Amino acid sequence: MDDKSMARGRKAFVTGFPIKHSRSPLIHGFWLKELGIDGSYEAVEVKPEDFSSFAASLAANGFAGGNVTIPHKEAAYAAAESLDEAACAIGAVNTLWLENGRLCGGNTDAYGFAANLDASAPGWDKADRALVLGAGGASRAVVHALLSRGVCHVSVVNRTLSRAEELAAHFGARVYAHGWDEAQALVSNAGLIVNTTALGMSGHGEGQDFPIDLTCAPKEAVATDIVYVPLRTAFLNKAEKAGLKTVDGLGMLLHQAVPGFERWFGQRPQVTQALREHILADMAKAGAL
């Protein structure tokens, strides 16, 4: 039996609360059509208080697995009977699947972050030092990716220093916590600068100047933002003006979807320019560029 026959009729999902904004159905729908797989991928809105029962009934509802987004990533971590290495390190699950009747959880955010940089800024992991702006949930995946790829020194900057200290303590050696007032000084020797804050994204001061001068960064430094709405954030605009190589956050969204699709439907999809343009067209239609 070939892979397409095995995947026939398989169902997968993305769940969050709210979920109508998700572009995951567009991504997976594109791949299902491209690969000629007779499967489906749907958005399912689940309230936080209902998540445990939803996760427990995946098989009964005919799902092979699915993606989990805000606010359910920690609840999915708790619900999974088995976790992959990335999920254990990050403390959150964004991908669920069933294996011999057991609910398994993984985290593909770190993979997506690194794969996006591999595609758009090859050699980025030669940087000895990285600067991560923000210490929220998303920054954990970024730090895990950086450590996994051998970055020697990761500085995490946050307005609330205790959040950065908590993250540094979680990962241990090679991760250092700093207050926001130290960010400017840290830019000068950072080979990779990652923005994980909401500054400059839609509804969070878009159009305003990013509050850090990037002109003192090494000329070979790479600047990347995990935000993809808007596509060109205030941070990326400022980095570009400073002459730095910039990588937007859309690629992370596309690449993080690859491992889950392969698990549920049995074929590994490709992140192509055609897929990117498909998502950009939807973003333009929604006024999200």
Swiss-Prot record:
PANTHER family associated with the record: BIFUNCTIONAL 3-DEHYDROQUINATE DEHYDRATASE_SHIKIMATE DEHYDROGENASE, CHLOROPLASTIC (PTHR21089:SF1), SHIKIMATE DEHYDROGENASE (PTHR21089)
A cellular component annotation (GO) from this entry: cytosol
Residues reported in the UniProt entry to bind NADP(+): E85, G134, A135, G136, G137, A138, N158, R159, T160, L161, S162, R163, I226, G249
HAMAP family found in the cross-reference section: Shikimate_DH_AroE
Name listed for the protein in its UniProt record: Shikimate dehydrogenase (NADP(+))
Positions that bind shikimate: S22, R23, S24, T69, N94, D109, Y228
Native species: Brucella canis (strain ATCC 23365 / NCTC 10854 / RM-666)
The protein's annotated pathway: Metabolic intermediate biosynthesis; chorismate biosynthesis; chorismate from D-erythrose 4-phosphate and phosphoenolpyruvate: step 4/7
InterPro entries referenced in this protein's UniProt entry, alphabetically: Aminoacid_DH-like_N_sf, NAD(P)-bd_dom_sf, SDH_C, Shikimate_DH, Shikimate_DH-bd_N, Shikimate_DH_fam, Shikm_DH/Glu-tRNA_Rdtase
A Gene Ontology BP annotation from the UniProt entry: aromatic amino acid family biosynthetic process
